[in-house]
Swiss-Prot record:
This is ATP-dependent RNA helicase DBP4. Residues 265-429 form the Helicase C-terminal domain. It comes from Meyerozyma guilliermondii (strain ATCC 6260 / CBS 566 / DSM 6381 / JCM 1539 / NBRC 10279 / NRRL Y-324) (Yeast). ATP-dependent RNA helicase required for ribosome biogenesis. Involved in the release of U14 snoRNA in pre-ribosomal complexes. Required for pre-rRNA cleavage at site A2. ATP binds at residues 90-97. It is an enzyme of class 3 (hydrolase). Residues 1-22, 575-604, 638-731 are annotated as: Disordered. It is found in: Nucleus, Nucleolus.
Length: 754
């Protein structure tokens, strides 16, 4: 068989038949969609298999246990499959994510989009966590389709994303990063875009992304299909819908209905407590719900950090996590995954997790700080009781916030049950917090910044019927946080601070006047560098500013405009008495002179419960009389002391009895040792033995021996050559049997001499 020439086309019948099969499947799918009427067939569909969707999409849904349709999915998916614009509104946790992901996948399948067709679907989410969650759901249900999907969020490498963004068919991201790529990325072509999805549109507008969304809409073709989903329908959302949607179909909650309703399986409670008792109540709540999954909301990130660090040191017995906007992206994702997989845990968070995130099986949602409006309350409590599960919520309200907030919620048909706290179950932790702040300056600094950020968050709220900063007990709240005093707060004009906070750094730099040069552009002399030197052993600049009352640091939760030029007149300077001689200057710096201005020293001690006391505490006469009659106090004191002495007497008698027994044991032991020593000394005396015997002929007869017969003395063996140890020699004195008196006298003399 001859080989085909190089460059000649090769007809592959299998490939051609496969393409024809795909086209036939798409045509059949389009025919089913055209014949489908959402108005008449809505009552007959209850599962995904009843929808005109492809086999691959249905298989991916079935593998992830997505079988039945929710209300919003039943109304939105059929309309979106017919390529019409949709404006969907539904309660939180109702399944809005699948309501737009399924139509997006089916739209790309019917248009026969491949990896060479570029960007075909764009999904905009308000937060990074929600974008990541949407991307994960897309990869699960779309695993049997050949589309390429990408995720672009803040906190990642922009250059890395630009190199690969041109090959994506579906792009999911946050408004800021998508707008940046549309302006800067060369390969990001949007002329072939088929679908645009705006998820949690109201949240995007509340977070200040209106300009970014307008920029995104300006880059997209007019012929696209737009799906807008939101939990509430505010005026801003309606304005956005008029600009981005063409003859939209409204599904879910109608436009004349109130704020999104609360899930029916959610139990809602609120308690009325003072601002100073919130930390105590939160601690008591955690200690009594150790086998629960709890989500705690604060109004600022500094409060989240302080509560996390303080409770972590106190060890409540449950896993603690924290999540706020200034976290790094990797840390935020890690925290989100840990809390999702945990069975019993507590997450301290800001409103960054109040929208769209699906944490499974949350038992309690606790709002330590009052939400800014009813919509924020709805989104916070919507993290629990999702998809028909059971859940509970608890709202802590200060006395100045109760009346106004309850009225706002009742106006939106949200009723709360009031809960009373049993004082015996309430645990006070302010002494422990005070002890921790005394031992750790960093925790004290966090507490000061948490106090300031909370006061500022209350001050900038628009609803002054609820948020009354002048009625808050600042001194008591600072004491409850464990602070030694009330920090100084410089609240400046907050108008435009939110816009400045959400504005990019490049635009903020362009708005500055040209005369105000940055410190890096100024020429610094040798003397400038000398005065700018700082000792390396001092605390951080941020902490020093806090100690001095300057709370306008760059890491604060709110931006404030600082004054650049400080003009101080000469008459405003204080008249200081400067020493004129070395002797006077040395005397002024002496310890004796410094003690005059400092006053008397004070020393504090901590008891076992962490409460501070002065080293010497005396009771006044008035305090003594206020406790009752002196004779009754005397009798009570004497009875208490007698009872204490009787208890101590029993212990003393037992101690004395043990001492006597021990003394008796030692005396017996000494007697035993003395007796053994006497027996040992007696055995040594018996070693000298006297033997009485008769005449010894061999000894008495002295045989003459020649020198030849004498043997030389043998060599003394070494200590290691001796086979047996030498025994102690016994002195034996042998004498003949005495016969006369002279023999007895000689024997006696010999014994005495030996």
């Amino acid at each position: 068989m001859a080989k085909p020439k190089k460059g000649a086309k090769v007809n592959n019948p299998n490939r051609k038949s496969r393409n024809q099969k795909v086209l036939q499947t798409i045509a059949d799918l389009q025919k089913r969609i055209d014949e489908y009427d959402p108005a008449t067939d809505e009552q007959s569909i209850s599962q995904f298999k009843h929808l005109p969707i492809s086999e691959g999409t249905y298989k991916g849904l079935l593998e992830n246990n997505f079988v039945s349709l929710t209300d919003i999915q039943k109304k939105a998916i059929p309309v979106a499959l017919k390529s019409e614009d949709v404006m969907g509104t539904a309660r939180t946790g109702s399944g809005k994510t699948l309501a737009f992901l399924v139509p997006v996948i089916e739209k790309l399948i019917r248009e026969n989009i491949t990896e060479y067709d570029g960007l075909a679907a764009l999904i905009v989410s308000p937060t990074r966590e929600l974008a990541v969650q949407t991307f994960e759901v897309l990869t699960k249900i779309g695993k049997y389709n050949s589309f390429s999907a990408g995720l672009v969020t803040g906190g990642k490498d922009v250059k890395y994303e630009k190199e690969r963004i041109s090959r994506m068919n579906i792009l999911i991201g946050t408004p800021g990063r998508i707008s940046q790529h549309l302006n800067e990325a060369v390969g990001m072509e949007t002329s072939n875009l088929q679908v645009l999805v705006l998820d949690e549109a109201d949240r995007c507008l509340d977070m200040g992304f209106r300009k970014q969304i307008d920029n995104i809409l300006g880059h997209l073709p007019v012929t696209r299909q737009t799906l807008l989903f939101s939990a509430t329908q505010s005026d801003n959302v309606k304005d956005l819908a008029r600009l981005s949607l063409v003859n939209p179909k409204r599904v879910g909650v109608s436009s004349d209905q109130e704020v999104s309703s609360i899930p029916e399986s959610l139990e809602q409670y609120y308690i009325k407590i003072s601002l100073a008792s919130k930390m105590d109540v939160l601690w008591s709540f955690l200690k009594s719900h150790l086998k629960s999954k709890i989500l705690v909301f604060f109004s600022s990130s500094k409060q989240v950090q302080f509560a996390y660090e303080a409770f972590r040191r106190l060890q409540p017995g449950i896993s603690l996590l924290k999540l706020y906007g200034r976290h790094k992206q990797t840390s935020r994702l890690e925290t989100t995954m840990k809390f999702s997989r945990a069975q019993h845990a507590c997450l301290f968070a800001t409103d960054i997790v109040a929208r769209g995130l699906d944490f499974p099986a949350i038992d309690w949602v606790v709002q330590v700080d009052c939400p800014e409006d009813a919509a924020t309350y709805v989104h916070r409590v919507g993290r629990a009781a999702r998809f028909g599960r059971q859940g509970k919520s608890l709202l802590m309200l200060a006395p100045s916030e109760e009346e106004g907030m309850v009225k706002r919620l009742e106006a939106h048909k949200i009723s709360l049950k009031m809960m009373n706290i049993k004082q015996k179950n309430k645990k006070v932790i302010s002494p422990q917090l005070q002890s921790l702040c005394f031992q750790d300056p960093e925790l004290k600094n966090l507490g000061q910044r948490a106090f300031i950020s909370y006061m500022k968050s209350v001050h900038i709220q628009k609803d002054k019927d609820i948020f009354k900063v002048e009625e808050l007990p600042a001194a008591e709240y600072a004491k409850a946080l464990g602070l030694p005093g009330t920090p100084n707060i410089n609240i400046k004009n907050g108008a435009g601070n939110k816009d400045k906070k959400n504005m990019s750094r490049e635009l903020l730099a362009l708005q500055k006047p040209e005369k105000q040069k940055s410190d890096s552009e100024k020429v610094r002399t040798k003397y400038d560098r000398m005065f700018e030197r700082q000792n390396q052993t001092v605390l951080s600049k941020n902490y020093l500013n806090m100690a001095a009352g300057d709370d306008s640091g760059s890491e604060d939760d709110f931006m404030s405009v600082k004054r650049k030029d400080h003009i101080i007149k000469d008459e405003e300077l204080p008249d200081l008495s400067v020493p004129v001689s070395k002797r006077q200057s040395k005397k002024a710096l002496s310890k004796k002179a410094s003690l005059k201005s400092k006053g008397n020293p004070t020393k504090l001690i901590f008891d076992d419960e962490g409460v501070t006391h002065h080293l010497y505490e005396f009771e006044d006469e008035e305090d003594f009389k206020s406790r009752g009659d002196a004779k009754l106090q005397k009798a009570e004191f004497v009875s208490k002391e007698n009872e204490a002495m009787s208890k101590a007497d029993v212990d003393d008698k037992a101690t004395a009895r043990e001492k006597r027994q021990e003394k008796k044991r030692r005396w017996k032991e000494q007697e035993r040792l003395a007796r053994e020593q006497d027996e040992f000394s007696g055995s040594e005396d018996e070693a000298h033995t006297v033997t009485l015997a008769g005449a010894d002929i061999d000894r008495d007869m002295d045989y003459g021996r020649s020198s030849e017969d004498e043997q030389p003395p043998s060599k003394k063996p070494k200590w290691f050559e001796q086979e047996k140890p030498k025994k102690k020699k016994v002195d034996i004195v042998e004498v003949e049997e005495p016969e006369t008196l002279e023999d007895l006298e000689a024997l006696t003399a010999k014994l005495i001499g030996s």
